[in-house]
Amino acid sequence: MTLNPWAVKARALDRYRWRLLRERHSLLGSALRFAREALGDWWFGLRAKYRLAASVDIESCDFLLLQSAPKVIAFQRKKLLIEGVRGRGYHLLETALRPPRTILRERLLKRPRHAVPTRYFGMAAHAEWLVQHHQPRVLLNDRNGSLYAPFLRLALAASGGLLVHLAHATTVERSRRLGMNDYDYYFLFGQSSLEALQARMLRFGSSTAVLVGSHMIDDSYVMPAPDLATRTLLILGVGPDKEKESAYQQTYALLASWARRHPEYRVLVKPHPRSQAPFWLGVVQATANVELLGADCSLAAALKRASVVVNILSNAVIEAALAGRPVLCVDLGGQQDIFQQQRFFGPVIRAEDELEQRLLGIEADFGQALEQSRAFAEFHLAHGAGGLASTLDALQRLHDGNSLSAELRTVTLEAHPANL
């Protein structure tokens, strides 16, 4: 008897989602949440059965970039990648996952090739519609943890296509979404991401992890070593949710106090892209040597002006290290050191006098500080500033049916436990 791979996948998803809930909730709490999620999925699936498209118009492409939501497209986070793929002569279309109500209203649904339990019928039918509508050779998935991914992979396999998941950051955080691993290829930034995924106790599906580097970084981060004589500190701000917390207000206050006591230093503040920087707006009005950088100032441009970077809790510390800037971590929030900054840059700074001593240490042994940044960047970013070119080359090879370059490290990431 031939097994139905779609139904097998659906049953495995049930097991996976139950285990995800049990990681955070009691047996009763997990059961209630599981039932609530199942009811919502079942209702979507039931309605989807009556909203199937009578026919599917074809809008084919070589690459289909599937973003997590329509609003994400406007952020243009994949601009370099899109331009690179199109620059190589391929037809790339960019679209986004729609909410269930839109999928139902617009009949973006096609009956899956095999029977699927009602709970997952809506997801499977939309995945089938996407593949039949666009007929991509390679589908580039952006959303971590998407429950559509397993069905996209099945639909693509039936038509000779591939599902490639593009990590849009290092995968070192503890987000439950990173348990999804059901892709043909999983493009990772570097060694730290691979180690973090291998250490996870819950992985759904299998994939071939490829250390391609970051497709979001170009050679703008290749710059001369900083001039310590400029005495310019760049502070990387935290996200708008975190910066409201008292511990991060205290961290900001520590840095602002230090800046007031050291007018010989120029202090630049690069806010998080989503932050309005309310704390620093007040500081710059009262402190002449503090400058709040505007949204039009790129991270690379900010790093060019900096001699030392102060990081609190920002992914941008990786770009700072790649740019060859010494890094100091200042944090009163007590967050887990997910980037392993202490391993490379020393203990977290929690007082003004510590910051002063560490700056003196950088001035005393500048070569060591640069070596620490180089090692940190290599740990997190394969191929350094060449990540975009590496990613484009890998995508071209996959599209053309060729093997990946021997220079790329590939590792099989199996499901864990094995029944997922």
Model-derived segments and spans:
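Short, charged, surface-exposed secondary-structure boundary motifs
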Residues: 102-104, 173-178, 196-200, 219-223, ...
